[in-house]
């Protein structure tokens, strides 16, 4: 039996700003649906089988409360250059990854502010 993580829900304070941020990083917008009291946006990073969703009425969690979500890349320097080229503020290095995860991630982790 295959078990696959499909979606992670991120609480955000400004749906349009969050959508612009992820679009600016080159993430694919899979959905942007709304009704009278709700809106859901789903975006997926290039090459990822897992997406994130955010919106209005999607979760009761506080904006910014999600912790411990990681994107892993094969080449951190190339990924950083691509993100900076798209206007992202990449905080590098992110030493907590090296202390906490050590060998498992090595030089494949960075923090992106947005």
Where do the language-model regions lie?
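Short, flexible, glycine/charge-rich loop motifs used to bind or transfer phosphoryl groups or to couple energy/partner
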Residues: 42, 58-60
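Vicinal oxygen chelate
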Residues: 12-16, 62-63, 68-114
